[in-house]
Amino acid sequence: YNIVGEEKFPAEGNFLFISNHRSNYDPIIQWTVFKRYKISFISKKENFRIPMYGRLIHRCCFMPIDRKNPRKAMETVNRAARLLTETGNSVGVYPEGKRSKECRLLPFHSGVLKVAQKAGRPIVVSTIEGTENIFRNIRRFRKTVVTIKILETIDADRVKSTKTSELSDYCAGLMKNELEEQEP
């Protein structure tokens, strides 16, 4: 894997980590690569029922979210905000809410950014590319290059003072511009 911009992570403290979502491998790869930041990802509750994978993400302290129940989803957002304020852990989310099969950025669910706003923590904006090829390349015994780019860290003061919808549009714009630059 290649990591670009790791120096853009906050020098200290925890944060909300956001990324585009291309593959089921994304959270495990990002959790492994950035293990020292103790990122607990939010994942759809159905993933916790997948044999072996569900056990793995549970052990990695991932948090289930019920995407079909807004009240329960907000409980997960509040739990994640408490995790940021009460522990040294960071939280990771995919604001698109699902994998993009076309490798294009899907519309954001801006509510997940409330995790950082409620906790008063910075947001680390990133992109991941290449994970969509892992399964196909494994079957052909080919190496897959995965690139993770840290685009920007939005400081906590700006996170708290900006409307959630504006923050969402800004983050989506950063990610979309980066992903479009990388298209062949």
Residue ranges and their predicted role:
Residues 1, 39, 146-148:
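A broad, low-specificity signal marking well-ordered, structured residues that form hydrophobic/aromatic
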Residues 1-15:
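Membrane-anchoring hydrophobic helices of lipid-metabolizing enzymes
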Residues 6, 20, 33, 44, ...:
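Generic beta-structure capping elements
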Residues 7-9, 31-32, 54-55, 82-83, ...:
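Short secondary-structure boundary/capping segments
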Residues 11-70:
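Catalytic core of membrane glycerolipid acyltransferases/transacylases, capturing the structured
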Residues 74-184:
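Non-catalytic C-terminal accessory region of glycerolipid acyltransferases
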